[in-house]
């Protein structure tokens, strides 16, 4: 993995995309399906050729790049995005310090990879299996991420599964972000450069 601005922007957009999708589901009970599929597939891509390969291509990160450019601001929605991002980074840091959890995470992801040989990854049961990895491996590490949205929507089991699966995808991108040199300080001091890079990528779509 190269430690370039491009790589950090791609990894950060992956985090942003997972967060934007969590917001969509938590509020409305549905989300951009193409972006959702990209984010969930990224969890299972554990041996990528490069940073972009985790997600496929740049256009598959359009929602995340747009969130990076326009979504992180002082509005209530923007503040929520920032809160989710900081929470994901904090969880990733705790995860990295726990060899037992990392080993368990790897085993559980491999199990889902094997299941995809027989089942569609986007069947409800498979999304539930991905969500259970977050619930069993990531949640106990803490701190818990408080998801805000429409209560009646969040009470639906299928939406809870999608949200947890997306939070796991956010962790996947947070791990990638650290691998390519991303640090929490970049959220404050390096974001302008990432926004400029994201704008270039969006302009050529």
Curated annotation (Swiss-Prot):
Q: Entry's Pfam families?
A: DUF489
- Key words, A-Z: Cell inner membrane, Cell membrane, Cytoplasm, Membrane
* The keyword rRNA processing is annotated on this UniProt entry: no
What the entry lists under InterPro entries is as follows: HflD (IPR007451), HflD-like_sf (IPR035932)
Q: Which GO terms describe its cellular component?
A: cytoplasm; plasma membrane
Q: Where in the cell is it found?
A: Cytoplasm; Cell inner membrane
Recorded superkingdom: Bacteria
> Do you know which HAMAP family this protein is assigned to?
HflD_protein
Instruction: Indicate the family of this protein.
Output: Belongs to the HflD family.
Q: What is this protein called?
A: High frequency lysogenization protein HflD homolog
Organism for this UniProt entry: Vibrio vulnificus (strain YJ016)
């Amino acid at each position: 993995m190269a430690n370039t601005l491009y790589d950090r922007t791609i990894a950060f957009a992956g985090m942003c995309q997972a967060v934007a999708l969590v917001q969509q589901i938590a509020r409305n009970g549905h989300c951009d399906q193409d972006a959702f599929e990209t984010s969930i597939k990224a969890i299972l891509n554990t041996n990528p050729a490069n940073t972009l390969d985790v997600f496929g291509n740049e256009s598959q990160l359009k929602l995340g790049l747009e969130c990076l450019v326009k979504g992180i601001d002082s509005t209530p929605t923007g503040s929520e995005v920032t809160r989710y991002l900081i929470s994901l980074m904090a969880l990733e840091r705790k995860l990295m310090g726990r060899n037992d959890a990392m080993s368990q995470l790897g085993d559980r992801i491999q199990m889902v990879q094997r299941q995809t040989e027989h089942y569609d990854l986007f069947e409800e049961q498979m999304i539930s299996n991905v969500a259970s990895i977050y619930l069993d491996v990531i949640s106990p590490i803490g701190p818990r991420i408080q998801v805000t949205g429409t209560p009646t929507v969040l009470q639906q089991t299928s939406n809870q599964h999608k949200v947890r699966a997306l939070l796991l995808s956010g962790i996947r991108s947070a791990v990638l972000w650290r691998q390519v040199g991303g640090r929490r300080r970049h959220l404050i001091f390096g974001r302008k450069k990432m926004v400029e890079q994201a704008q270039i990528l969006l302009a050529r779509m």
